[in-house]
Amino acid sequence: MSFDIAKYPTLALVDSTQELRLLPKESLPKLSDELRRYLLDSVSRSSGHFASGLGTVELTVALHYVYNTPFDQLIWDVGHQAYPHKILTGRRDKIGTIRQKGGLHPFPWRGESEFDVLSVGHSSTSISAGIGIAVAAEKENKQRRTVCVIGDGAITAGMAFEAMNHAGDIKPDMLVILNDNEMSISENVGALNNHLAQLLSGKLYSTLREGGKKVFSGVPPIKELLKRTEEHIKGMVVPGTLFEELGFNYIGPVDGHDVLGLVTTLKNMRDLKGPQFLHIMTKKGRGYEPAEKDPITFHAVPKFDPTSGCLPKSSGGMPSYSKIFGDWLCETAAKDNKLMAVTPAMREGSGMVEFSKKYPDQYFDVAIAEQHAVTFAAGLAIGGYKPIVAIYSTFLQRAYDQVIHDVAIQKLPVLFAIDRAGIVGADGQTHQGAFDLSFLRCVPDMVVMTPSDENECRQMLFTGYHYQDGPSAVRYPRGNAVGVELEPLTKMPIGKGIVKRHGEKLAILNFGTLMPEAAKVAESMNATLVDMRFVKPLDETLILEMASRHEVLITLEENAIMGGAGSGVNEVLMANRKPIPVLNLGLPDRFIPQGTQDEARAEIGLDAAGIEAKIRTWLA
């Protein structure tokens, strides 16, 4: 979309953060209003993360107004809320390309802009990185300031508290801003708190505070008494005791939509020494009533008409794999009250909304705490229940030690329902489910299943749920199922594949939902097609049979080639002295950027045309 100067006259004056800092302070509310309207106009035309950015407009304006970015370093946690930041840092005219192939990255990205200090996508990393950045600046004697912005969801993760505990110990000069948009920590927002925040962050209070520390440093009982008195007084009116105990100077909560008040408070805090903590209260979806009322639905949106206030409805095609899982979950829970479903803040994405309403006593959303989710499930299994951990492939990476140490070593029957496996599309490098087959198949006693369609997905979930000799995993992609008939649920024989088509010289061993593409190639090349189903244990008998009957083998998977299912096939062949040529096809050894799933598969040659072209080139 072209930028309409007439609609956004103040925003038009801001082509850089230097120009922003030249504006009179009184113009910042108008700038914030225009920035919010421009964000609404842009995202509604192009799609993208929406509600979070609407809630951080004033904060973003205030931060770039007060701090000398990019010299001063601003770190956004996760990055859903960073669209206003991108608009103000030279990417305004490209914001309509966000999450598209060749367009702006969906999150802050170091390779995209010097203003993006940390590449992000997963949550709760900002404070840890910020401490390292602040320490590096101090060691280089650079007078740059470090600011981390983290949400009230992300701050619940253990990593964030580990970082704050460390900051309290080494006391770097840095500011952590808690963007609290769920009222989950405090509701004490109002004129008194805003005034108190400005008072507590002001020079007079800070001077008296530091002066008192020096005067009474040699009199420990008095120093301790003053410290406890200060904590008591602040604790009566602010909810920051926890952060104070971690070693931060806590200020807040303040109104995160009062841009002038934020500027005053940030200026006061800018030169304070040691770890500082500013708690701001915002409203997700601010300024657009439908998003304010339903921020979850408007978290990430397709193209829509903002005047209607409604998102486009589903076209009514095939159900998503997430829905297939959710329906199976409800169906199983209706027959077994021992089922316990666990998810780390992925209720909507994992298709668990209906289940959470129907079976609230069997549903646990542990927040952004993947490590805890897995070990919590281990405890449920020890207690005689049947836990299912519903988690995205990319987030399971964060709990790998728990999968091994707390589940697999003890051979606990935990079922992992791994959503968003393979190419996910618009969220790019940080969210592709590229590695789960590689890091799971090397874990002893783990059963790993890759369905080729929704019927197999249900059968595998059923099989894993009833498997009691250790952990199991079923991985399935983002997107819609293929439309096959759903059969009655039965347990599948563990580690057995099936031949779908008999051919001549070539055999394609397919793992997972690339099966429709593999079928087209098999038909075109008169190849044998095998639905391998299991990555672990592999069907070694079937692999050796295919090797004996064919001249070459092709393995196909939507996982990293290195260490993936194809590598397992190679190992079987070598162990059995079957020196047959094998071509492993899958995700290449690089991080795959944003774009649609179809665009990504076409680019890396995992659509039917690309698969056939790679095979023919290899055979030539």
Curated annotation (Swiss-Prot):
One Pfam family per UniProt: Transket_pyr
Record: residues binding Mg(2+): D152, N181
Cofactor: record remark: Binds 1 Mg(2+) ion per subunit. Binds 1 thiamine pyrophosphate per subunit.
EC numbers, comma separated: 2.2.1.7
Source species, domain of life: Bacteria
GO terms for biological process, alphabetical: 1-deoxy-D-xylulose 5-phosphate biosynthetic process; isopentenyl diphosphate biosynthetic process, methylerythritol 4-phosphate pathway; terpenoid biosynthetic process; thiamine biosynthetic process
Record-stated family: Belongs to the transketolase family. DXPS subfamily.
Function, in words: Catalyzes the acyloin condensation reaction between C atoms 2 and 3 of pyruvate and glyceraldehyde 3-phosphate to yield 1-deoxy-D-xylulose-5-phosphate (DXP).
Descriptive protein name: 1-deoxy-D-xylulose-5-phosphate synthase
Phylogenetic placement of the source organism: Bacteria, Pseudomonadati, Pseudomonadota, Gammaproteobacteria, Enterobacterales
Gene: dxs
